[in-house]
């Protein structure tokens, strides 16, 4: 669960393909606070941290996530919004946000 309040910004440094999945290497000050297997919000999409080295961490978006979100359009150099998972013993500012994306839409007006 997330609050929807952006804590950090991250820069997509590298993208690699693994079958139908996209692996993102993201540089951010958030990396020093992350742990492997921790969920985080990446532009509102819940992705799991797979590795952390210095100020770069790795996450993978599977085919369904790429199909139902805008993660498939991310490119090296893009800046994305980051938020760590909400703590139940902290303040609950913002809103309850799960980060499970059902689809995308285009705003025409």
Put a short name on every predicted segment.
Residues 1-109:
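Conserved loop->alpha-helix
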């Amino acid at each position: 669960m997330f609050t929807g309040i952006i804590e950090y910004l991250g820069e997509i440094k590298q993208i690699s393909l693994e079958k139908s999945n996209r692996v993102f290497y993201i540089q951010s000050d958030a990396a020093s606070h992350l742990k492997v297997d921790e969920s985080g919000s990446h532009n509102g999409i819940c992705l799991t941290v797979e590795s952390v080295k210095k100020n770069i961490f790795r996450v993978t978006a599977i085919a369904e996530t790429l199909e139902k979100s805008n993660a498939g359009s991310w490119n090296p150099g893009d800046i994305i919004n980051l938020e760590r998972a909400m703590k139940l013993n902290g303040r609950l500012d913002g809103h309850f946000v799960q980060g499970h994306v059902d689809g995308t839409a285009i705003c025409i007006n």
